Structures are given as structure tokens and as C-alpha cells.
């Protein structure tokens, strides 16, 4: 006859089995994701950095997430957010007009070039920088703030000790291997993007404006967005530079799930290498599987 003591012991073991199984399953899933990212990186011939934050429980998926990568145009999010922060204490700031001269134009100016010998508001510059990756718009935002170091100072005010902006467009895109200028890590950028878009780093009106700009991005259809179900809502900012550097940072709203924050950075050993947005799409598909 089974004694009460033995019965209690068996019930205790049986009760813990689902937990043990769950832990083992999660561990196996995590290993599988890491292995898939490693295989993707190996097949690409480059270096891949990924950081995903699941805001439902703040769990993370990380791959080379503490290594530095050139940000390229993903740094535009920080510059635009810094201007939005200023507008919290000056409700008319975003309507301030900035002169656009022909001499201001650099290598990519799809919006600013239409306003040469005219003006754009800071709000229009923010939209141009984030939704069209307009480099002149980025430079105007940086100039308004007082230089690249002021963008870095804004990051520090948010508790981001990793982000650093040293140059303006287009030189911030040189992405030279080992060069710390204009770099961050995937994890640092993911944490800051979360704070800016889903947290308290900006007041509600400014936060909503940043999210609206990101959701309206026109340059990301082949990057993170391409690896996600079409029904998911995405706000992102892409970036690219020398050494085939190909980046995308995103806030993602899956169906029936809390938002995800995903940073994908990729770079290659050859200066003239082609961009690889397909690598970012593949990484996004790997890390969001199951959500």
C-alpha cells in the first residue's frame, strides 16, 4: 500500500515535471535560435549582431549583442528624438524653419533637394530623416542640436553609455572595421529604442510622434519587415554604409502580443561589399518565430 509520505513525494515530483520540461524546452529553443543565427552569419561571410527584447516579460534574444557596430543611418533616430525632447519645453519648436541651401546637399537628399533656396520645419526634417533617410535632413537636425556630441549627450541623458556619434552625413557611414566612431551595440540600441518608443524617455506627444515617423518609414520593406508576417505592425529605421554594412532597428507589434524591439546590425570584411538586407530579414524571421 502506498504510504501518504510516498504519495506526497510522487505528487511533488509530478508537479515539477512540467516546469522542468518547460525549462528544458526553452533552453533547447534558445540553443536552436543561437545555432540558426550562427549558421546565417557563417553563410553570409560577415559579422551579425542581433538584440531582441520581448516587452511582455523583458526576455531577450542576443547574438553578438555587446559588440560594437557602425550605426549608419539608424543613428537618425537618436537625433530626431533629441529634437523631440527639446520640443517638450518649447511647443513651437517643431515649426521652426531651417534654410536649405544647395551647398547643404550631400550624397542622398530625396526630400531636402526639393526645398533648395527654401526652408523646412524641424518637424519636416525629422520626417525626412526617419522616413526617407535624407542625409541633409539629418545634418540639419545635428546642426540644430549643436553637433554630433550633443546627440551623444542626449543618449547619455537616457542612460545609454554606449552610443556615440562623432561625425555628420555622409562620413559617419565609413564603418571601418574596429573604428569606434559612430557606433553602438545591438543591446544598447535596443534598450534605448524601447525607452524612446515604449517607455518614459519622451513625453506622450513626442513619443507618439516618433512612433508615427517610424511606422511611416519607406526604406525598410526588404529588411526586418520582410522577415515578419504582413499582418504585424512595424516601425523601423534602416541604415547602410561601407563594408556592406546593412542595419535595421525596429519596434514590432505582433498580433495579440506585447511589442517586440529588434535591432539587426550586419557588416562585412570588404569595403565595397554589397548591402545584404536579406540577412536582416532572415535574422528577424529566426528570432521572432513563435510569437
Swiss-Prot record:
The lineage of its organism: Bacteria, Pseudomonadati, Pseudomonadota, Gammaproteobacteria, Enterobacterales. The keyword Repeat does not apply. GO terms for biological process: beta-lactam antibiotic catabolic process; response to antibiotic. Belongs to the class-A beta-lactamase family. InterPro entries: Beta-lactam/transpept-like, Beta-lactam_cat, Beta-lactam_class-A, Beta-lactam_class-A_AS. It is an enzyme of class 3 (hydrolase). It comes from the Bacteria. The active site is at residue 73. Gene3D superfamilies: DD-peptidase/beta-lactamase superfamily (3.40.710.10). Keywords: Antibiotic resistance, Hydrolase, Plasmid, Secreted, Signal. It catalyses: a beta-lactam + H2O = a substituted beta-amino acid. It is found in: Secreted. Pfam families: Beta-lactamase2 (PF13354). One of its GO terms (molecular function) is beta-lactamase activity. A beta-lactam binds at residues 76, 133, 169, 240. GO terms for cellular component: extracellular region. The class A beta-lactamase family has a specific amino-acid numbering system, sometimes called Ambler or ABL numbering and often misspelt as Amber. A multiple sequence alignment was used to derive a consensus sequence and then the consensus was numbered taking into account insertions and deletions. This allows use of identical numbers, e.g. for active site residues, despite differences in protein length. UniProt always uses natural numbering of residues, hence there appear to be differences in numbering between this entry and some papers. This is Beta-lactamase CTX-M-2. Has cefotaxime-hydrolyzing activity. Its EC number is 3.5.2.6. Monomer. PANTHER family: BETA-LACTAMASE, BETA-LACTAMASE-TYPE TRANSPEPTIDASE FOLD CONTAINING PROTEIN. Residues 1-28 form the signal peptide.
Amino acid at each position: 500500500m502506498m504510504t501518504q509520505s510516498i504519495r506526497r513525494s510522487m505528487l511533488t515530483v509530478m508537479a515539477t515535471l512540467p516546469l522542468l520540461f518547460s525549462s528544458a524546452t526553452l533552453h533547447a529553443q534558445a540553443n536552436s535560435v543561437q545555432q540558426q543565427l550562427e549558421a546565417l552569419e557563417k553563410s553570409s561571410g560577415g559579422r551579425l549582431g542581433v538584440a531582441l527584447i520581448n516587452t511582455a516579460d523583458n526576455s531577450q534574444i542576443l547574438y553578438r549583442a555587446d559588440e560594437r557596430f557602425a550605426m549608419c543611418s539608424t543613428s537618425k533616430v537618436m537625433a530626431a528624438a533629441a529634437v523631440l525632447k527639446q520640443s517638450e519645453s518649447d511647443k513651437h519648436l517643431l515649426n521652426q524653419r531651417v534654410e536649405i541651401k544647395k551647398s547643404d546637399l550631400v550624397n542622398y537628399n530625396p526630400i531636402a533637394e526639393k526645398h533648395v533656396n527654401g526652408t523646412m520645419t524641424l518637424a519636416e526634417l525629422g520626417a525626412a530623416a526617419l522616413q526617407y533617410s535624407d542625409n541633409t535632413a539629418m545634418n540639419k537636425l545635428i546642426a540644430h542640436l549643436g553637433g554630433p556630441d550633443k546627440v551623444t549627450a542626449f543618449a547619455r541623458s537616457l542612460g545609454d553609455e554606449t552610443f556615440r556619434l562623432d561625425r555628420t552625413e555622409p562620413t559617419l557611414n565609413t564603418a571601418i572595421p574596429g573604428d569606434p566612431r559612430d557606433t553602438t551595440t545591438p543591446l544598447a540600441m535596443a534598450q534605448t529604442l524601447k525607452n524612446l518608443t515604449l517607455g518614459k524617455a519622451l513625453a506622450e506627444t513626442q513619443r507618439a510622434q516618433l512612433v508615427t515617423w517610424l511606422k511611416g518609414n519607406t526604406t525598410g520593406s526588404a529588411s526586418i519587415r520582410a522577415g515578419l508576417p504582413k499582418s504585424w505592425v512595424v516601425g523601423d529605421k534602416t541604415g547602410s554604409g561601407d563594408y556592406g554594412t546593412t542595419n535595421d532597428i525596429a519596434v514590432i507589434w505582433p498580433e495579440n502580443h506585447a511589442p517586440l524591439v529588434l535591432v539587426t546590425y550586419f557588416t562585412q570584411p570588404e569595403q565595397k561589399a554589397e548591402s545584404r538586407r536579406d540577412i536582416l530579414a532572415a535574422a528577424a524571421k529566426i528570432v521572432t518565430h513563435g510569437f
